[in-house]
A protein has these predicted regions:
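Walker A/P-loop
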Residues: 15
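Active-site signature of alpha/beta-hydrolase-fold catalytic machinery across serine-
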Residues: 20
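Conserved nucleotide-sensing/catalytic segment adjacent to the nucleotide-binding pocket
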Residues: 23-84
């Protein structure tokens, strides 16, 4: 039983990481899809109750926001893995600008998320933490979070 919590600004590649690494094995929990916290909580609860692996694909910039997934997952004896999906600020803004209108975030919103983003820590309750960046070859560079310095911010 495993819960994966993705963290990162809009346009950093969280959904792409989900598709590339977890699509065939984990349910995707995303406010982009579910639209309300009640629906999101119901889906998380269903995953926990049935032992279904899941990935939370939201920005999750702060420990308080991550806690809503970590605490119930830990209580259900799930292994909790975090991924900080980072990207250069200019690249995040460029990717966001290329999104369809319904998925585009105002640049001020993206900058606001970047300013609120606090790197996750094991003390929050994660069993593992990984740092993911998109590689130039289209794949992913994934390494332990504790060994990677922060990328330049917004």
């Amino acid at each position: 039983m495993e819960a994966v919590v993705l963290c990162g600004v809009q346009g950093s590649g969280k959904t792409t990481l989900y598709r590339d690494r977890f699509l065939e094995t984990h349910v995707r929990v995303s406010m982009d899809l579910l639209r309300t916290r009640a629906r999101e909580a119901a889906l998380v609860r269903a995953c926990l109750d049935t032992g279904q692996r899941f990935v939370v694909d939201n920005t999750n910039p702060t420990p308080a926001e991550r806690r809503r997934y970590l605490e119930p997952a830990r209580a259900a004896r799930f292994r909790v893995i975090g991924y900080l999906v980072e990207i250069e600020a200019a690249e995040a803004l460029a990717r966001n600008a290329e999104r369809p209108d319904r998925r585009r975030v105002p640049p001020a919103g993206l900058v606001g998320t970047a300013r609120r983003l606090i790197r996750p820590t094991l003390e929050e309750g994660f069993d593992e933490l990984w740092h993911a960046t998109a590689a130039r070859d289209g794949g992913w560079r994934v390494e332990p979070l504790l060994t990677t310095p922060p990328l330049p911010g917004l």
